């Protein structure tokens, strides 16, 4: 959500709020797109747009909002970077099937370097509930990468 903030506002009782950071208008900053039917990989939301944001971190230096997903709407959850100046949304990380992005942290300055850190938890959880989708994914993985999934 994006908020317009201002001072000089009053609460519902008419008392002045002692802050210059009072939200006076709110709108959706980034929205995803649900699909009417799942795509060929089993995604219930457009994989090129955000779904179920869960963890966020803002980097003032990069002017970027980092957003981790925890969604049953994407087969693989993603970590996104949204530049607040250009309004560009970029997918920068994909977790294993069923895992969620967590532990998100952006460090603006350590010895001249900037770091974006993230990890994931409970990989494979999706596999237990969506075996037909996993079989489709496994076929595509074998075709494209000559690999196979680890079955739990």
What are the residue ranges of the model-derived segments?
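Surface-exposed loop and turn segments in beta-propeller and other repeat-based domains
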Residues: 13-48, 93-97
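Short glycine/acidic-enriched loop and turn motifs that connect beta-strands
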Residues: 72-73, 123-125
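Conserved small/polar residues in nucleotide/adenosyl-binding loops
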Residues: 150-152
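Loop/turn-rich, solvent-exposed surfaces of beta-rich toroidal or solenoidal domains
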Residues: 43-86
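Conserved blade-ending motifs and adjacent loop-strand segments that build the rim/top face
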Residues: 88-107
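Residue-level detector of Asp-centered blade-edge/turn motifs that repeat once per structural unit
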Residues: 60-61, 108-112
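Conserved beta-propeller blade signature
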Residues: 64-68, 113-118
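Hydrophobic/aromatic beta-strand positions that recur at structurally equivalent sites within the blades
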Residues: 2-3, 82
